[in-house]
């Protein structure tokens, strides 16, 4: 198979378009593959939409039923006057409920990753696994304090009680 054949083959597999209502707004999502298989849920990033997964999702349909959502305000979903992490979590849950999924594996890109991370705290039983692609992960301050330059290459935003405490912890790297 040439470098472009797999891409053309993926795009030739057309998804089924569906809608579910969440808090009075229509939320659009796409479905590829047999609904008898385990769920694989794709969540797009900022300024994106469900069709960004058109060439990716078909690669998984031998083992999964793949779904990609248009979060509210994106793609074919309705727009809202107000958006929140909780509303996005409810949209994810509603699609899973519509698909009759009690649990699914999730792959999320960019802003979709932070939305998914938040959704895991609201609907933890829904997530069998979560894969983040190019997403920012913000750790709670109590977890960040355990890192040091000797243990991790993670750049963390530390929270200090005052300016003097912050300045006293400043170190040049490398020393």
For the regions a protein language model found, what residue spans apply to each?
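Structural signature of beta-strand start/N-cap positions in the alpha/beta core
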Residues: 39, 63-65, 100-105, 126-129
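Conserved alpha/beta-hydrolase catalytic His-Asp/Glu region
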Residues: 158-175
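Conserved catalytic-core motifs of eukaryotic protein kinase domains, centered on the activation segment
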Residues: 52-54, 77-83, 141-144
């Amino acid at each position: 198979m040439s470098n472009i054949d797999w891409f053309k083959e993926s795009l030739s597999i057309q998804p089924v378009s569906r809608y579910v209502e969440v808090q009075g707004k229509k939320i659009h999502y796409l479905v590829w593959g047999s609904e008898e298989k385990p769920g694989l849920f794709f969540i797009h990033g900022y300024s994106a939409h469900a069709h960004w997964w058109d060439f990716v999702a078909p690669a998984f349909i031998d083992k999964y039923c793949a779904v990609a959502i248009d979060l509210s305000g994106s793609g074919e979903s309705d727009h809202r006057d107000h958006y929140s992490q909780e509303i996005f979590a409810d949209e994810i849950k509603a699609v899973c409920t519509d698909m009759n999924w009690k649990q699914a594996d999730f792959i999320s890109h960019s802003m979709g990753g932070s939305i998914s991370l938040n959704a895991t705290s609201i609907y933890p039983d829904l997530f069998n696994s979560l894969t983040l692609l190019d997403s920012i992960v913000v750790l709670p301050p109590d977890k960040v304090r355990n890192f040091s330059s000797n243990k991790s290459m993670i750049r963390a935003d530390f929270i200090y009680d005052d300016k003097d405490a912050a300045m006293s912890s400043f170190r040049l790297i490398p020393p």
